[in-house]
Amino acid sequence: MRSLNRIVMQKASRDWITSLGPERLDVAEISGRWGEGMGFRSHQSFHYPRHDPCTGPFRDEAGKVQKFDLIMANQVWEHIDRPHTATRNVYRMLRPGGWFWVAVPFFIPYHAVPVDCSRWTARGLTNLLIEAGFDEARIQAYQWGNRHVARRNLETPWPPEYREGDDLTNDPDFPVVAWAMAQRG
C-alpha cells in the first residue's frame, strides 16, 4: 500500500538521502525499515522498547556509544514520551558531519502505537533540532498537505491509500506531514 500521507515526503526524502551517497553511510533506523534497500554501506534497525532513544544513546556490547553517518526516524517521534531528550541522544550518536532525518505527522488521527504524544510543523521540527544542538544553518525542514488529504484521513480504513488522481498540491497552511534533515557540525 502506498500511503497518501507519505507519498510526497518519501519522494523528497529519498532524493535527499540519495544525494548523500548512501553507499558510504553507516545507518541506524529507529523503529522502522523504510531505509532497507537504499544501498547503505550498513543499515541497522533499532526497535522500541529494547532500544529507547529517550533513555540514552544506543550502545554496543562493550557499553560504548554507537556512531552513525545517518540516523533515520520515520513516523516514530510522535510516539515517544520525551522527543527532546531522544533528539539530543540522536545528536550524540552521530559522527561529525552525520545527518538525522526525521519525518512526523501533523494533521492525522490519533494513533497510539503504543502511545501518541506529539505533533510538529516544519518550524516545530526546526526548533526541536536546534534545541538538541543542531545548527539552524544545517537544518532543512519541509511540510506538505492540503484539505483533500486531510479529508481522506477521516476515512476508514486508515491511513488512506494513494489513488491515482489524488490532489498532491501543497497548501502551506494545511500541513499533514513534516520532515527534516539536520547535519551535526
Predicted regions and their residues:
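Short amphipathic alpha-helices and their capping/turn segments at secondary-structure boundaries
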Residues: 17-21, 87-92
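S-adenosyl-L-methionine-dependent methyltransferase catalytic module, highlighting the catalytic core
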Residues: 3, 81-89, 95, 99-185
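A short SAM/SAH-binding and catalytic strip from SAM-dependent methyltransferases
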Residues: 69-81
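Conserved N-terminal segment of class I S-adenosyl-L-methionine
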Residues: 1-72, 175-179
